[in-house]
Design a protein with these regions (language model features):
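Catalytic helix-loop patch of NAD(P)-dependent Rossmann-fold dehydrogenases
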Residues: 78, 82-86, 108-155, 162-176, ...
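N-terminal Rossmann NAD(P)H-binding glycine-rich loop of SDR-like oxidoreductase domains
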Residues: 3-19
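NAD(P)-dependent short-chain dehydrogenase/reductase
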Residues: 141-155, 159, 163-215, 221-222, ...
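NAD(P)-cofactor binding segment of oxidoreductase domains
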Residues: 71-99
């Protein structure tokens, strides 16, 4: 199987390429990134897809600067919405499957019943980043003829995403929603907390951490493994092995404050902290206050807890001098 990964130099893309190169089923791994794959170029997707003719494309490329998206919503829609549709249309034309990576920010976060969001729950993005990613989901579904409710429920009802959804004329499509991604490369939430904690310790100040934003910290390495497992299964069930909307996150939930305190515990940094509400933290983009996703069944089983994943990740980080 020939598998292409967009955004191959990013946090998730790096983990995907690394994982795929160790998989026997992936005969060839195509790592696509700038300048060859450019989300701002309408012809970029077709040019690559038609030339390489992959069996599956994992579309991990995105503009994930949520504040930048809020300040430039037109650019966000171009990169995270329109570009997804262009990739999906190119893949359909050559009969390639597509895995589109999406976000928990397609939900408005106003849920008050304490239940996690399921793939079949109504969406309502609270910010331009989420709106653009949701537009990308819809564009991909339109290209693949997967606009019905049965597609949204396929991953949940089939046990591991192995159920056909009544559209045999097109290849398989998976939308993988995730949340709060951390891992190398790049500065992620744990690294930002470490930097802020060291600065607070040096200056003798208190760290202020948001306590009413709840989500699912997810390790890029674990997310990549789950996506690769879905691709591995894609040849089963008559070619519909990964159809549907999948929620893929590490097990468990946390507030930003709880996540930060676990980071500080692992780093053995003792600084005073203060919980503050989101309303006091000024930023261009408003995240969903409740962004917890209910994981859908996966071929290799549920992901480990976010605490376990974070502990492993810490072994890879440079130690404080």
């Amino acid at each position: 199987m020939r598998v292409a990964v967009t955004g191959a130099g990013g946090r998730l893309g790096t983990a995907l390429v690394k994982r795929l190169t160790d998989e026997p089923f992936a005969d060839e791994v195509l790592a696509w990134d700038l300048p060859d794959h450019d989300l701002d170029d309408p012809r970029s997707a077709g040019r690559l897809v038609f030339a390489a003719r992959p069996d599956v494309v994992i579309h991990a490329a995105a503009w994930t600067d949520v504040n930048g998206c809020a300040e430039r919503p037109d650019v966000a829609m171009r990169r995270n919405g329109t570009a997804v549709g262009e990739m999906a249309e190119a893949c359909v034309r050559i009969g390639a499957g597509l895995v589109m990576v999406s976000t928990n920010e397609v939900f408005d976060g106003r849920r008050t019943d304490g239940l996690p969001y399921r793939p079949t729950d109504p969406t309502g993005a609270p910010n331009p980043y989420g709106a653009a990613k949701l537009a990308g989901e819809l564009a991909a579904r339109l290209a693949y003829g997967a606009s019905g409710d049965d597609f949204a429920a396929a991953a949940t009802s089939a046990g591991s995403g192995t159920g056909a959804v009544g559209r045999p004329a097109t290849p398989p499509l998976a939308i993988v929603r995730t949340a709060w991604l951390f891992g190398l490369p790049g500065a992620d939430f744990p690294q930002k907390i470490l930097a802020a904690a060291r600065a607070a310790r040096q200056s003798g100040t208190t760290m202020r951490i948001v306590s009413d934003e709840i989500g699912c910290p997810t390790y890029a390495t674990d997310l990549a493994a789950a996506i690769v497992a879905l691709v591995r299964e894609s040849g089963r069930a008559g070619g519909r092995g990964f159809d549907g909307i999948h929620h893929v996150v590490n097990t468990g939930r946390a507030s930003r404050a709880e996540w930060a305190r676990e980071v500080l515990r692992l780093a053995a940094i003792d600084v005073p902290t203060e919980d503050v509400p989101m309303a006091t933290w000024s930023r261009p983009s408003n995240p969903p206050g409740w962004g917890v996703l209910e994981p859908t069944p996966l071929p290799d089983g549920s992901l480990r807890t976010w605490q376990s994943a974070l502990a492993e990740y810490f072994e890879l980080l440079p130690k404080e001098p």
